From Swiss-Prot:
Any one biological process term the GO annotation gives: lipid A biosynthetic process
Matching Pfam families: Acetyltransf_11, Hexapep
EC code(s) of this entry: 2.3.1.129
Protein's organism: Chlamydia felis (strain Fe/C-56) (Chlamydophila felis)
One GO CC term on file: cytoplasm
Start and end residues of each stretch annotated as Disordered: 258-279
Keyword DNA-binding carried by entry: no
Keyword list, A-Z: Acyltransferase, Cytoplasm, Lipid A biosynthesis, Lipid biosynthesis, Lipid metabolism, Repeat, Transferase
Protein name listed in UniProt: Acyl-[acyl-carrier-protein]--UDP-N-acetylglucosamine O-acyltransferase
Compartment(s) where it occurs, according to its Swiss-Prot or TrEMBL record: Cytoplasm
Pathway stated in the Swiss-Prot or TrEMBL entry: Glycolipid biosynthesis; lipid IV(A) biosynthesis; lipid IV(A) from (3R)-3-hydroxytetradecanoyl-[acyl-carrier-protein] and UDP-N-acetyl-alpha-D-glucosamine: step 1/6
GO terms, molecular function: acyl-[acyl-carrier-protein]-UDP-N-acetylglucosamine O-acyltransferase activity
Length: 279
């Protein structure tokens, strides 16, 4: 049963699904769609052509679907789509897109923490975490299972690969390859996200191959492109390695991040459970 508090403002035309809860002082504009089992907590504001997927919770004072912070926007019809079972926490801002017919999209099972900002034309995959005050500029792409730490700033048009983990307070100006971990401003890669991949039950052999490929590519005396081709020949049969190589071979206009710390090249050993540990 849908439960709408009498102080909430729901404009005529808004589409409200089954078992939706809308708390006091919420504002829902006329072109919004809330799917079944959505919860919108007090003072949240949802505008524009926004669709909120089933089971998602919008926390107090979040603002979704409002006019993009882009001077090029001239009132075109644009969209926001949020997937299922997401958590959009307090004071998060997800603006609408720029250019007719384009969409800001967020996948399923994402956690957007307080004060995070998702700008126009961003595309976020599923199972992504944006930590407190993470700021995504326009046209940023964040792939599945990536984690972006607190107070990170991401330059427009940057891509962040799947399963990457971006450390807090980082400034990200170039594409971050999938499966990597790093931090800093300027940003430096720290190698493969070994702990994250192990937690997600990526096979040991795959994790080890990714580590070897990262080292081959990032400390090779050959050119970056040549090192990628060599890695392709040796490890390209592994899907995750293929994904890493393809990502690096097809950068955005920002280019691939090339900086890496010395720790990224430490030798690896294996503990008795088969987990990778640093020597």
């Amino acid at each position: 049963m849908t439960n709408i508090h009498p102080t909430a403002i729901i404009e005529p035309g808004a589409k409200i699904g089954k078992n939706v809860v809308i708390e006091p002082y919420v504002v829902i504009k006329s072109t919004v769609t809330l799917c079944d089992d959505v919860v919108v907590k007090s003072y949240a504001y949802i505008d524009g052509y926004t669709t909120v997927g089933r089971g998602t919770t919008i926390w107090p004072s979040a603002m979704i679907g409002n006019k993009p912070q882009d001077l090029k926007y001239q009132g075109e019809k644009t969209y926001v789509t949020i997937g299922e079972k997401c958590e959009i926490r307090e004071f998060a801002i997800i603006t609408s897109s720029t250019f007719e017919g384009t969409t800001v999209s967020i996948g399923n099972n994402c956690l957007i923490m307080p004060w995070a900002h998702v700008a126009h034309n961003c595309v976020i995959g599923s199972h992504v975490v944006l930590s407190n005050h993470a700021q995504l500029a326009g046209h940023v792409v964040v792939e599945d299972y990536a984690i972006i730490g607190g107070m990170v700033g991401v330059h427009q048009f940057v891509r962040i690969g799947a399963h990457a983990m971006v450390g807090a307070l980082s400034g990200v100006r170039r594409d971050i390859p999938p499966y990597t971990i790093g931090t800093g401003n300027p940003y430096q890669l720290g190698g493969i996200n070994k702990v994250g991949l192990q937690r997600r039950q990526v096979p040991f052999e795959t994790r080890l191959a990714l580590i070897k490929v990262f080292k081959k590519v990032y400390r090779s005396e050959d050119s970056f492109s040549e090192a990628l081709l060599e890695a392709q020949e040796e490890y390209g049969h592994i899907p995750e390695v293929q994904n890493f190589i393809h990502f690096c071979q097809n950068p955005s206009k920002r280019g691939i991040e090339r900086g890496a710390t010395k720790d990224a090249f430490q030798e690896e050993s294996v503990d008795k459970e088969g987990a990778l540990i640093e020597s």
